[in-house]
Amino acid sequence: MLRSALLSAVLPLLRAQPFPCPKTCKCVVRDAAQCSGGSVAHIAELGLPTNLTHILLFRMDQGILRNHSFSGMTVLQRQMLSDSHISAIDPGTFNDLVKLKTLRLTRNKISRLPRAILDKMVLLEQLFLDHNALRDLDQNLFQQLRNLQELGLNQNQLSFLPANLFSSLRELKLLDLSRNNLTHLPKGLLGAQVKLEKLLLYSNQLTSVDSGLLSNLGALTELRLERNHLRSVAPGAFDRLGNLSSLTLSGNLLESLPPALFLHVSSVSRLTLFENPLEELPDVLFGEMAGLRELWLNGTHLSTLPAAAFRNLSGLQTLGLTRNPRLSALPRGVFQGLRELRVLGLHTNALAELRDDALRGLGHLRQVSLRHNRLRALPRTLFRNLSSLESVQLEHNQLETLPGDVFAALPQLTQVLLGHNPWLCDCGLWRFLQWLRHHPDILGRDEPPQCRGPEPRASLSFWELLQGDPWCPDPRSLPLDPPTENALEAPVPSWLPNSWQSQTWAQLVARGESPNNRLYWGLYILLLVAQAIIAAFIVFAMIKIGQLFRTLIREKLLLEAMGKSCN
């Protein structure tokens, strides 16, 4: 049985007639030839067998592709002619390629195609004409390609497309029109592409997305419109794209967006809007988009955000809100509902302060970038309950101090970047430095934070401070946090230094001077001694006064007794 099976497998190979491989080609695969060099105009002289199924021709000399180049190749299925400087193609060149399924003519110098050049290739499934010099296309060029599934016209010089150019391409799944000079897409251009899955229109000069242009593309999963000149998107332009998963609108000229523009694209998992001069966002922009994983709003002119802007994006994992020079404040609760958020980019904005609850509810947050802002202080509770937080970037702000426990109870924290801030290394920073002493590996080594003052600690890095002797008097007695408004109104305990002493201490710290500890404690002890002496004097006086009263009472009683005796 095994012997007969082997014979059955080998006999067809033995019966196959090998074809002669041209000297200038390689034939490493049966029925396939790979040739380079030579002239485009003399392909017929290579002597390629007519029973080939695959031909790859590349790096040939410039010339015109002649109509007899592939005569008799009726079984050819894959043909690739790339990097060969083809300047033109004679009519009828592909007439014998009736079984061709893939035609690749990439990276040539083709400026136009004869009207009927593709008519005989009715089985064609893939056509790639990218990286050429095509300026216009005949409206009937693709009329017979009813089985075409992939069409690449990218990297040409197309500025206009006839409205019915793709009317016969009902099986099309991929259409790449990127990197051309298109300024407008006519109505009805994509009316027949009900199976289209990928539409690539990026890097053109489109100025608008008109109503109805995309209405029949219900199967579309990827739409790329970035790097155009878009100034407007029609309301409801994306409403029929129920299967869309990726939408890119970045790098355009959009100053505003219609309300509810993304209300019906619930399947989108990636959305980019960055590098647009957006002035504001409508109160309602996104619908229930639980599948959205990434949202990019970088490089805009936004000065604030609607409070409920991201409320419906419960599955969002990455949110980029960076390089917005006018974004100076965040409304309360703007990130509410983003329970799955992992990465939050807020760097290179104009944020001067953050609310204490700005990050509340972001239990899965791992990275937050706040560098290159104008932050002068951070609330103590800003990072509270962010148990998954791993990295915090705070470089290039205006921070002078930090609460000692601002990063406490963050078990996953591995990186805190604090460089390029005007740190005031006085007793107000001491508790944070003490926390840092117990977490030495958390601070970045490349750009360590340095003290701006006071002398003599100016220009010292935090590492040098931690390695030196303690310079803050009795740091254990320092309050954990700055006093609150209620604390300022509370009565001052009698054992605290008086107001003159507090003012003197505050003036020394404000001037960046270290207080004279010995003088301070000497005055304090002298005050205690004076208080003790005064108290002793008062007690002594009270005793004497008591004794005097007792003497006077005794004498009065004696006088009264003597008076009664005389009577």
From Swiss-Prot:
Membrane-spanning segments = 523-543
Q: Which SUPFAM superfamilies match?
A: L domain-like
Q: Where in the cell is it found?
A: Membrane
- Membrane topology, record value: Single-pass type I membrane protein
GO biological-process terms attached to the record: blood coagulation; blood coagulation, intrinsic pathway; cell-matrix adhesion; megakaryocyte development; negative regulation of platelet activation; platelet activation; positive regulation of platelet activation; release of sequestered calcium ion into cytosol
Renumbered ranges of LRR repeats:
75-96, 99-120, 123-144, 147-168, 171-193, 195-216, 219-240, 243-264, 267-288, 291-312, 315-337, 340-361, 364-385, 388-409
Q: What is this protein called?
A: Platelet glycoprotein V
Q: Write down the species.
A: Mus musculus
